[in-house]
Each structure stands twice: as structure tokens, then as C-alpha cells.
């Protein structure tokens, strides 16, 4: 048995996510926790609606971002983050925007300029499987300098199991 945790962040699979100014939430939190000199400036958009996304948004504010907004697929009533965590984030000035999913990240000279969201109509299908449905005609563009993707975590195995008989 090997338990290493899910230390990698997931990307959204949208155009522009490799631009300068885009990081995964866990990558950002790791840099904040390991190096207190991590700073942000300008406007930050956090994509995600779980507790980690709330932590990322609050850390972004503390790292110097002038304005922090969260956007998630879920409506407020099914948002996975703890209600008290969301309330505390809002008390700190973080805006929470429900039922929006990323469509693309707009760039200029390789840097984040804005993120385009599309309205999320539902997150799961009739069988309860993750299968977001969108209104591709209901779009919102949010200007920002930083995008922090906090939409899930992944395992980064690297060479950890190289030379072992452990099967995945």
C-alpha cells in the first residue's frame, strides 16, 4: 500500500491555460506555503467551488491581489465548499460567482488578459455523473492578470514506483 496524496493540480483543458499568470490552485498554495515571498498583483480569478478553491482565493488576497473572484460550475446550494468557509471568504471581500464554467483564457503577449466563462445549466446528468451542460450563448468575460485553477487534484507519480513491483 502506497499513500502519497494528490499533490498535482488539474487544468481545465481550455485555450490559453498555459499562459503566464495561470497556475493550478495546489501549485499556488504550495508556493505560498514554501516561500512566503510569493506575491500576486492585480485581479485574480479562482476557478473552482470546493474548499481548496476557497483556500486558494483567500491566500491570493493575502498574497497581495487587489481583487479576487471565484467562479464555479455549481449553483450555490450544491457548491461543494463548506458554507461557513464561503461566508468567511465573502466577508473578506472575495466575490463568489456560481454556475459559470471556463471557456477560454484570453492572452496578450503570452500573459493572461481575461477569462471567458459560459453559463453552466447543470453539473451532473440524470445518472448523477459529472457531465456539465452549458449555454454557449450566455458568456461573461472577466478581465484579470491571474487565473488560479482549483478544479481538482491529481497524483504525480514521477519515478516513485520505478524499479518496484507495485502495480497501479
Regions found by a protein language model. Name each.
Residues 40-50:
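Beta1/beta-strand and adjacent pyrophosphate-binding region of the FAD-binding site
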Residues 57-58:
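Generic hydrophobic/aromatic pocket-lining and core-packing "Φ" positions
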Residues 2-11, 23, 27-40, 62-168:
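A Rossmann-like FAD-binding core segment of flavoenzymes
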Amino acid at each position: 500500500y502506497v499513500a502519497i496524496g494528490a499533490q498535482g493540480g488539474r487544468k481545465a483543458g481550455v485555450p490559453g491555460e498555459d499562459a503566464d499568470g495561470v497556475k493550478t490552485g495546489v501549485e499556488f498554495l504550495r508556493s505560498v506555503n514554501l516561500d512566503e515571498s510569493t506575491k500576486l498583483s492585480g485581479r485574480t480569478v479562482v476557478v473552482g467551488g470546493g474548499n481548496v478553491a476557497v483556500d486558494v482565493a483567500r491566500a491570493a488576497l493575502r498574497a497581495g491581489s487587489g481583487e479576487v473572484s471565484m467562479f464555479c460550475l455549481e449553483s450555490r446550494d450544491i457548491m461543494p465548499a463548506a458554507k461557513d468557509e464561503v461566508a468567511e471568504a465573502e466577508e473578506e471581500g472575495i466575490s463568489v460567482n456560481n454556475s459559470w464554467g471556463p471557456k477560454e483564457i484570453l492572452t496578450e503577449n503570452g500573459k493572461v488578459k481575461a477569462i471567458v466563462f459560459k453559463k453552466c445549466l447543470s453539473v451532473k446528468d440524470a445518472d448523477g455523473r459529472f457531465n456539465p451542460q452549458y449555454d454557449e450563448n450566455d458568456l461573461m468575460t472577466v478581465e484579470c492578470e491571474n487565473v488560479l485553477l482549483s478544479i481538482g487534484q491529481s497524483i504525480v507519480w514521477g519515478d516513485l514506483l520505478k524499479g518496484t513491483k507495485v502495480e497501479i
